[in-house]
């Protein structure tokens, strides 16, 4: 194999190119999501285009101590990754959680088909991959994100328009959709609503802060095979115009101070199993929330660069001592 020399030591060209690719993925901006600062006035409609984002799903509860430790940092982590990931959190209907949205429980039941036994909190799943359990599993989550990005070569192309109505509700409607050959006739389009800075009400066990982020409150699913809405919860209205999910699928939801709305192309519920890959075909997110300050972003960027640099030094050290 051809090799790249560095003094008396050498590195595999393949390893070098792969490391370079990882750096490009980490530090090159992407345009698969749109974030609008909630402190600004909303005075226009927004076109959201993409599909390449990776869906990162978290199972969490408001009473979970380990969740309380890591949750405050996850929004900054999501900001550090930018549009490369779309992170949401499901809170179960367990009788103890302070939120228990039916839409979250629906998505948990979907995960139970592909990940039997899921239930520990916090649990993270990157694009339908392995369960990563516990707050100390975050390095594995980061590794999964990088691995899936390298493999995510042909995502579906998604676009929707988000607008604010006269009564302060919001409507998201499909603008265009190209499956790129993914999941033809056996897939669905899903609008998912996640609310940010949700106040934890009194009377519930809460070892963490007063608010939680990325709580999934709304889900609406449109089957592309028969152009029907097969599930809807947490939305004021879900409808299909022109009898077409691809062109006429739209949802309206109540006024929310801060939120994310995701459009996902994924397998239908009936075609999920623990023996088949359950990764999504395409994901794009629109976020309307308060942006983390630039210093937090700069610190996280320094950390990411630092870890990458340490990785190169460690690889050099390993080769030097062979």
Briefly describe each language-model feature range.
Residues 1-39, 64, 294-322:
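Secretory targeting signatures
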Residues 18-21, 120, 259:
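Short loop/turn motifs at secondary-structure junctions
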Residues 42-94:
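Local sequence-structure signature of Cys/Sec-based thiol-disulfide redox active-site neighborhoods
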Residues 51, 82, 119-121, 186:
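Extracytoplasmic
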Residues 55, 125, 190-192:
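Soluble periplasmic/extracytoplasmic beta-strand elements of cell-envelope proteins
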Residues 67-71, 100, 135-137, 201-203:
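Short, solvent-exposed loop/turn and secondary-structure capping segments
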Residues 79, 89-131, 135-155:
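Thioredoxin-like thiol-disulfide oxidoreductase module
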Residues 102-116, 142-148, 159-322:
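Short, conserved sequence motifs used for protein processing/export or organelle targeting and
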């Amino acid at each position: 194999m051809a090799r790249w020399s560095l003094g008396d030591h050498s590195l595999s060209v393949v390893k070098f190119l792969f490391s370079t690719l990882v750096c490009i993925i980490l530090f090159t901006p992407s345009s698969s999501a749109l974030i609008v600062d909630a402190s600004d006035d909303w005075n226009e409609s927004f076109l959201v285009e993409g599909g390449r984002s990776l869906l990162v799903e978290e199972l969490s509860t408001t009473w979970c101590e380990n969740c309380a430790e890591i949750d405050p940092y996850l929004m900054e982590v999501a900001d550090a990754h930018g549009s490369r990931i779309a992170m949401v959190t499901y809170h179960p209907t367990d009788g103890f959680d302070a939120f228990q949205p039916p839409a979250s429980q629906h998505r948990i039941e979907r995960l139970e088909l592909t990940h039997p036994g899921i239930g520990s909190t916090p649990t993270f799943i990157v694009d339908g991959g392995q369960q990563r359990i516990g707050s100390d599993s975050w390095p594995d989550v980061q590794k999964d994100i990088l691995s899936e990005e390298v493999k995510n070569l042909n995502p579906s192309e998604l676009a929707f328009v988000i607008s604010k109505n006269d009564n302060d509700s919001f409507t998201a409607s499909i603008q265009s959709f190209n499956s790129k050959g993914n999941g033809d006739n056996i897939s669905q389009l899903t609008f998912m609503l996640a609310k940010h800075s949700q106040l934890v009400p009194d009377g519930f066990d809460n070892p963490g802060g007063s608010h939680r982020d990325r709580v999934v409150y709304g889900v609406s699913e449109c089957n592309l095979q028969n152009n029907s809405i097969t599930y809807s919860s947490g939305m004021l209205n879900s409808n299909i115009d022109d009898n077409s999910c691809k062109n006429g699928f739209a949802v309206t939801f109540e006024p929310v101070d801060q939120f994310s709305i995701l459009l996902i192309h994924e397998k239908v519920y009936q075609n999920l199993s623990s023996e088949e890959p359950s990764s999504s075909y395409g994901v794009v997110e629109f976020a309307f929330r308060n942006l983390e300050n630039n210093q937090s972003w700069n610190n996280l960027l320094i950390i990411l660069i630092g870890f990458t640099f340490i990785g190169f030094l460690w690889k050099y050290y390993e080769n030097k001592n062979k």
